[in-house]
């Protein structure tokens, strides 16, 4: 029997399993209608916006046909590179789109200096670091984003991410300490913190009260070790199978889920796994994830 906390959680799956925004050639034959219909078949309630999604009118039409919702959308922030004013203009346009499709959160990652799309950088060793001055600017800018988002009924969900200046627990700690809890929330991503730090519970335990959005991404530890040994890029690592959906890798999601439930988390948990759809059938992977969630989390 589901608890009230469980009923406050919506389950989604990200479009990245069907098509990848960073490598457009991957899954290019998977169109919006196929993606959304697969999500319904697999049993999920919604998805996040992919780079190939249409404008609000067309998207809302396709969503309504299938009784699906949008959980959020990634925003590439360039506060350091462009300055707060210019970056905020782009973010406000992003919020206008999100409001039009009834999304609850704006997923934000500061992308200045990122190596996640690099063809050469070792994702395990070459991450960028911000100076103290840059940290101050990012935190100030994110607070401003939070003010903008609030005008549109949205929350900022900051995404700690491999290959960026805010990747580790230590860096996320600093971000949380220097931003306003009313304005900046945390997107907790199991896979990114597991690969970055090994321990994926410490970050959640430290900042559970700031979590406004969740990504459930599994990790194949043997593939991770292989990718580390080869010094692969981020894209090379996920094409090599480092990430997968819950139930197909080595992470235990039960303590994560139990922690969220115990703290009355309200919001989306989105299954996300960067994979090559030609090797990992998106619908099959979505069904594996849904089965795992139902059997090992909700009904356990």
From Swiss-Prot:
Species: Lactiplantibacillus plantarum (strain ATCC BAA-793 / NCIMB 8826 / WCFS1) (Lactobacillus plantarum)
Gene Ontology BP terms: inositol catabolic process
Catalytic activity reported: scyllo-inosose = 3D-3,5/4-trihydroxycyclohexane-1,2-dione + H2O
Entry EC number(s): 4.2.1.44
Pathway linked to the protein: Polyol metabolism; myo-inositol degradation into acetyl-CoA; acetyl-CoA from myo-inositol: step 2/7
The entry's keywords: Cobalt, Lyase, Manganese
The protein's enzyme class: lyase
Entry protein name: Inosose dehydratase
Pfam families: AP_endonuc_2
Cystine pairs: none
Family that this chain belongs to: Belongs to the IolE/MocC family.
Known cofactor(s): glutathione; Co(2+); Mn(2+)
GO MF annotation list: manganese ion binding; myo-inosose-2 dehydratase activity
Record-linked HAMAP family: IolE
InterPro entries hit by this protein: IolE, IolE/MocC, IolE/XylAMocC-like, Xyl_isomerase-like_sf, Xyl_isomerase-like_TIM-brl
């Amino acid at each position: 029997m589901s608890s009230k906390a469980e009923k406050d959680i919506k389950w989604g799956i990200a479009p990245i399993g069907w098509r990848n925004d960073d490598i457009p050639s991957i899954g290019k034959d998977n169109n919006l209608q196929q993606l959304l219909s697969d999500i319904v078949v697999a049993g999920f309630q919604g998805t996040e916006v992919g780079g190939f999604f249409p404008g609000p009118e067309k998207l809302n039409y396709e969503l309504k046909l299938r009784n699906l919702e949008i959980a959020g959308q990634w925003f590439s922030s360039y506060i350091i590179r462009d300055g707060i004013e210019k970056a905020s203009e782009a973010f406000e346009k992003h919020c206008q789109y999100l409001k039009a499709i009834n999304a609850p959160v704006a997923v934000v990652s500061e992308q200045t200096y990122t190596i996640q799309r690099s063809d050469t950088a070792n994702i395990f060793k070459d991450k960028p670091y911000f100076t103290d001055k840059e940290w101050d600017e990012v935190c100030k800018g994110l607070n401003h984003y939070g003010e903008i988002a609030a005008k549109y009924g949205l929350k900022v969900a900051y995404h700690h991410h491999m290959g960026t200046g805010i990747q580790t627990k230590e860096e996320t700690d600093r971000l949380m300490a220097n931003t306003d809890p009313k304005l900046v929330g945390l997107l907790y991503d199991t896979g990114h913190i597991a690969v970055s730090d090994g321990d994926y519970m410490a970050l959640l335990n430290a900042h559970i009260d700031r979590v406004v959005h969740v990504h459930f991404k599994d990790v194949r530890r043997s593939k991770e070790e292989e990718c580390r040994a080869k010094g692969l890029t981020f894209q090379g690592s996920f094409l090599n199978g480092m990430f997968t959906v819950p139930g197909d890798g080595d992470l235990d999601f039960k303590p994560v889920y139990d922690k969220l439930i115990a703290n009355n988390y309200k919001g989306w948990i989105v299954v996300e796994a960067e994979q090559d759809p030609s090797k990992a059938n998106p619908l099959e992977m979505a069904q594996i994830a849904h089965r795992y969630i139902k059997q090992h989390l909700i009904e356990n």
